[in-house]
Curated annotation (Swiss-Prot):
Tissues where the protein occurs: High expression in disk florets, moderate expression in ray florets and detected in leaves and stems, but not in roots.
Motif DDXXD motif location, chain numbering: 300-304
Keyword Transmembrane found: no
Enzyme class: lyase
Record-stated family: Belongs to the terpene synthase family. Tpsa subfamily.
Residues the record lists as binding Mg(2+) 1: D300, D304
Record remark on domains: The Asp-Asp-Xaa-Xaa-Asp/Glu (DDXXD/E) motif is important for the catalytic activity, presumably through binding to Mg(2+).
Binding positions for Mg(2+) 2 per the UniProt entry: D300, D304
Pfam families: Terpene_synth, Terpene_synth_C
Entry-linked Gene3D superfamilies: Farnesyl Diphosphate Synthase (1.10.600.10), Terpene synthase, N-terminal domain (1.50.10.130)
UniProt keyword annotations, A-Z: Lyase, Magnesium, Manganese, Metal-binding
Annotated protein name in UniProt: (-)-beta-caryophyllene synthase
Length: 547
């Protein structure tokens, strides 16, 4: 006992959860929801007709793209996946790279989002012969916004998109400033776009933002608007129900009392999983992922902010063994955590076992084992006071970011679309997953470095880079921000060229990167939960949209 009292732990005092037991109880209103679902189903039929009726009329193809854009931004595209794919395939087959309609930027963005590798050459139409952008575009807000959003679907080497981003951002910043008083609604719309482009937004947050904006458009479709509102609230009810289930599971672990050194961020972890997929058909996958992220957060704090080196070695070995028989070797406080990890994987194994997919958990377990090994390597470096080179650091840190583990884990429970080959692909860390890991690692390190320097902790990628290249922290941040933008371009490229993996699986990896952009663009909004994230959670999970 005396020996235990002498142990010096690198403990950190994280702020408690801001939610308490707010989401513990869920009131199910099935009868009322059934009526709403019936209305939604009828309205969906009309939208399907609207999409399909324009296919054979070339003069309507620009309007068709605008309709698809509205459907996507309103958050209801998941109802019309087949119709949208059929429409965009028809447009691609009809025009190839030679789009004849209006709004070429919109055409470019919508098709690239869908996985069609259309050429950016059409955007040269926005330029004069001397290479400058046309003056007429500088005051065309709609055209500027369309081009601005299109630039984020670029890949490495597409200089015209890089030039267009600089041009449109400069013009839009000026317009937003000029319109603050004369047209505050449009000014706010522009500022929201500049703050976070569509390509980096989570679908549910974009729906939340776009629904009131769409309602103010004189050209809005009243039926489409009502469908978006009703559907938003139906999904909110489902997500509340799921969060209630995860909340009760978390309450059973009682992390705040049993593992008080760890961040109590279960609600934020569910928000994270919700960002990866919001659709009803992925409900069980979402619940599992939320639990994994919640425990991964505790694992992170165990290795970073509490566990001593010898304890961490034992825990790492126990995870590699993955058996309840390993539990007796662990310190008392680690037993609850270890059992919690094993239990959620076993539970999911049983859930999907009836479909003959229990073996999918073996891939998820392997990714978790690798994740823990990366933590152990960082603990070893911290214990030895070793500052790795930038290259050494990133090789390990890409895994310790958790995103390669989550990219594999999030496939579990998604249904028949996930094959053994898809899991094997994810474990090879293909370019799109590497890019997502890069975004996660670099954004996290930029904002968490100062907090972590105050305790015994492995040197961050920022510190490794500063030491190796003898540069300032400010310089490293600039370099890392460019690397993050390059990683986004790599994600776009892979979504266009990788045809072996279904787009719904690619979207999970893209959405993981989008969550990072929401949580870490300005600060570590996950560890230090601020008003913005609280507002997001309240809007998505507490307050329904008025009909």
């Amino acid at each position: 006992m005396g020996k235990e009292e002498k142990v010096i732990r690198p403990i950190v005092h994280f702020s408690p959860s801001v939610w308490a037991d707010q989401f513990h109880i869920f009131r199910d209103e099935q009868a009322e929801q059934a009526n709403v679902e019936q209305v939604v189903n009828e309205m969906r039929k009309d939208v399907r007709k609207d999409i399909m009726s324009s296919l054979d009329v070339q003069a309507e193809h620009t309007n068709l793209l605008k309709l698809i854009d509205a459907i996507q931004r309103l958050g209801i595209a998941y109802h019309f996946e087949e119709e949208i794919e059929q429409a965009l395939k028809h447009i691609y087959d009809t025009y190839g790279d030679d789009w004849k309609g209006r709004s070429p930027s919109l055409w470019f963005r919508i098709l690239r989002q869908q996985g069609y590798y259309v050429s950016c050459d059409i955007l040269k139409n926005y330029k004069e012969e001397d290479g400058s952008f046309k003056e007429s575009l500088a005051n065309n807000v709609e055209g500027l916004l369309e081009l601005y959003e299109a630039t984020y679907l670029g890949v490495q080497g597409e200089d015209i998109l890089d030039d267009a981003l600089v041009f449109t951002r400069t013009c839009l910043e000026k317009i937003a400033k000029d319109l603050v008083h004369s047209n505050p609604t449009l000014s706010t719309h522009i500022q929201e776009a500049l703050k976070q482009p569509l390509h980096k937004r989570l679908t549910r947050l974009e729906a939340l933002c776009y629904i009131p904006m769409y309602e103010q458009l004189a050209s809005h479709n009243e039926s489409l608007l009502k469908l978006a509102k009703l559907d938003f609230n139906l999904l909110q009810s489902l997500h509340r129900k799921e969060l209630s289930e995860v909340s009760r599971w978390w309450k059973g672990l009682d992390v705040p009392n049993n593992l008080p050194y760890a961040r109590d961020r279960m609600v934020e972890c569910y928000f994270w999983a919700l960002g990866v997929y919001f659709e009803p058909k992925y409900s069980r996958a979402r619940i599992f992922l939320a639990k994994v992220i919640s425990l991964a957060t505790v694992l992170d704090d165990t290795y970073d902010a509490y566990g001593i080196y010898e304890e961490l070695k034992i825990f790492t070995e126990a995870i590699q063994g993955w058996s309840i028989t390993c539990m007796h070797t662990l310190p008392e406080y680690m037993k609850l955590l270890y059992e919690g990890v094993l239990n959620i994987y076993k539970e999911m194994e049983e859930i999907i076992g009836s479909e003959g997919k229990a073996h999918h958990l073996s891939y998820a377990k392997e990714s978790m084992k690798e994740f823990i090994r990366s933590y152990m390597m960082e603990a070893k470096w911290a214990n030895e006071g070793y500052v790795p080179t930038a290259e050494e650091h990133m090789a390990v840190a890409f895994v310790s970011s958790g995103y390669s583990m989550l990219a594999t884990t999030c496939f579990v429970g998604m249904g028949d679309i996930v094959t053994d080959e898809a899991f094997e692909w994810s474990l090879t860390k293909p370019p799109i997953i590497k890019a997502s890991c890069a975004i996660a690692r670099l954004m996290d390190d930029i904002h968490s470095q100062k907090d972590e320097k105050e305790r015994i902790h492995v040197a961050s990628s920022v510190e490794s880079y500063m030491k190796q290249y003898d540069v300032t922290e400010e310089h490293v941040h600039k370099v890392f921000h460019q690397k993050i933008e390059d990683a986004w371009k790599d994600i776009t490229r892979e979504s266009l060229v990788c045809k072996d993996i279904p787009m719904p699986l690619m979207m999970r990896v893209i959405n993981l990167a989008r969550v990072m952009d929401v949580l870490y663009t300005h600060k570590d909004g996950f560890t230090n939960v601020g008003e913005e994230l609280q507002d997001h959670i309240k809007s998505l999970l507490v307050h329904p949209i008025p009909i």
